[in-house]
From Swiss-Prot:
InterPro entries: Cyt_b/b6_C, Cyt_b/b6_C_sf, Cyt_b/b6_N, Cytb/b6-like_sf, Cytochrome_b, Cytochrome_b_C_euk/bac, Cytochrome_b_N_euk/bac, Di-haem_cyt_TM. Gene3D superfamilies: Cytochrome Bc1 Complex, Chain C. It comes from Balaenoptera edeni. Its cofactor is heme b. Keywords: Electron transport, Heme, Iron, Membrane, Metal-binding, Mitochondrion, Mitochondrion inner membrane, Respiratory chain, Transmembrane, Transmembrane helix, Transport, Ubiquinone. Belongs to the cytochrome b family. The cytochrome bc1 complex contains 11 subunits: 3 respiratory subunits (MT-CYB, CYC1 and UQCRFS1), 2 core proteins (UQCRC1 and UQCRC2) and 6 low-molecular weight proteins (UQCRH/QCR6, UQCRB/QCR7, UQCRQ/QCR8, UQCR10/QCR9, UQCR11/QCR10 and a cleavage product of UQCRFS1). This cytochrome bc1 complex then forms a dimer. This is Cytochrome b. It holds the Pfam family Cytochrom_B_C. It is a multi-pass membrane protein. It is found in: Mitochondrion inner membrane. The lineage of its organism: Eukaryota, Metazoa, Chordata, Craniata, Vertebrata. A ubiquinone binds at residue 201. It comes from the Eukaryota.
């Protein structure tokens, strides 16, 4: 008799995705981040649900409701900090997952990659709106500055910003709608993640060599379920250490001051995971130009499959491309650092140089290097 997991309509779907899935035998720990992102998402949805039970999306009570969660709700402080630091862990996993895709040429699966880019945008939007909810100084001014960028759009800009705000400034209407969107978006992310997986399972996983591995596949369970559990335990350990020992390490002290429209903080900056994009935005002294550069810095990911000029899929056997890849990582870390610094010399010029290098690497240097490597293969 056939096992029920292979015949039952619902269990069959789970079985084909997590049990009997043929998986390359040589995928490394860099392939763990997909499952870790799933774990992060579930954690965020659960902690967020419990926070929403005690939070009030109103300008007069939002800040004190968060204080109430931390002081009066049973283990409310744990839930709140798990949620805040969970977002940081989410982005660490997200960037590692994307870096893996870039390095090993996983972007050759066009549909999977494009859904991934859409997922990135959705997660970024969710994180931004979540940061506004505690209604501290950085929440308010972050929301004001970032939404105001849309006013750079010719002709409809100002109208669009006021439409998003629901008034003439960031106020009660803005907070309420941000809370509504922050609640619904994770479920949209969940649905998109399923589509992401469906497309991935059409082609099967890539592997470090970039060479098709159909003749050498092993079942996902027990090999990769075990490997994923190890990754999950390390993720949980890191998250718990952050939450229980240094809960405010990645946050901004300004957000412990209630929002005040009459007092602007000295340095307005987003959470650490947006700093690289914020640095690119600030490095262009023109509002519309900055907004376009900001958008392009993320949208450029959608162009990656078209910019692939190498005859090899993975960078595993391409030392020059590997070097440029790590230069790109160093450049992004530099941009992240610059984004957190004040707008003054020498940070401005370093930021401008790093921004130019970012686009130059992706659009010119890496494709040209790949062509040179193709020529070298014939020698």
């Amino acid at each position: 008799m056939t096992n029920i997991r292979k015949t039952h309509p619902l269990m069959k779907i789970v079985n084909d995705a997590f049990v009997d899935l043929p998986t390359p035998s040589n995928i490394s720990s860099w392939w763990n981040f997909g499952s870790l992102l799933g774990l992060c998402l579930i954690t965020q949805i659960l902690t967020g649900l419990f926070l929403a039970m005690h939070y009030t999306p109103d300008t007069t009570t939002a800040f004190s409701s968060v204080a109430h969660i931390c002081r009066d709700v049973n283990y409310g402080w744990v839930i709140r900090y798990l949620h805040a630091n969970g977002a940081s862990m989410f982005f660490i996993c997200l960037y590692a997952h994307m870096g893996r895709g870039l390095y090993y040429g996983s972007y050759a699966f066009r549909e999977t990659w494009n859904i991934g880019v859409i997922l990135l945008f959705t997660v970024m939007a969710t994180a931004f709106m979540g940061y506004v909810l505690p209604w501290g100084q950085m929440s308010f001014w972050g929301a004001t500055v970032i939404t105001n960028l849309l006013s750079a759009i010719p002709y409809i800009g100002t109208t669009l910003v006021e439409w998003i705000w629901g008034g003439f400034s960031v106020d009660k209407a803005t907070l309420t709608r941000f809370f509504a969107f922050h609640f619904i978006l994770p479920f949209i992310i969940l649905a998109l993640a399923m589509v992401h997986l469906i497309f991935l399972h059409e082609t099967g996983s890539n592997n470090p060599t970039g060479i098709p591995s159909n003749m050498d596949k092993i079942p996902f369970h027990p090999y990769y379920t075990t490997k994923d559990i190890l990754g999950a335990l390390l993720l949980i350990l890191t998250l718990l250490m952050l939450t229980l020992f240094v809960p405010d390490l990645l946050g901004d002290p300004d957000n412990y001051t209630p929002a005040n429209p009459l007092s602007t903080p000295t340095h307005i900056k987003p959470e650490w995971y947006f700093l690289f994009a914020y640095a690119i935005l600030r490095s262009i002294p023109n509002k519309l130009g900055g907004v376009l550069a900001l958008l392009l810095s993320i949208l450029i990911l959608a162009l990656i499959p078209m910019l692939h000029t190498s005859k090899q899929r993975s960078m595993m056997f391409r030392p020059f491309s590997q070097f440029l890849f790590w230069v790109l990582i160093a450049d992004l870390l530099t941009l992240t650092w610059i984004g957190g610094q004040p707008v003054e010399h020498p940070y401005v010029i370093v930021g401008q140089f790093a921004s130019i290098l970012y686009f130059l690497l992706i659009l010119v240097l890496m494709p040209v290097t790949s062509l040179i490597e193709n020529k070298l293969m014939k020698w």
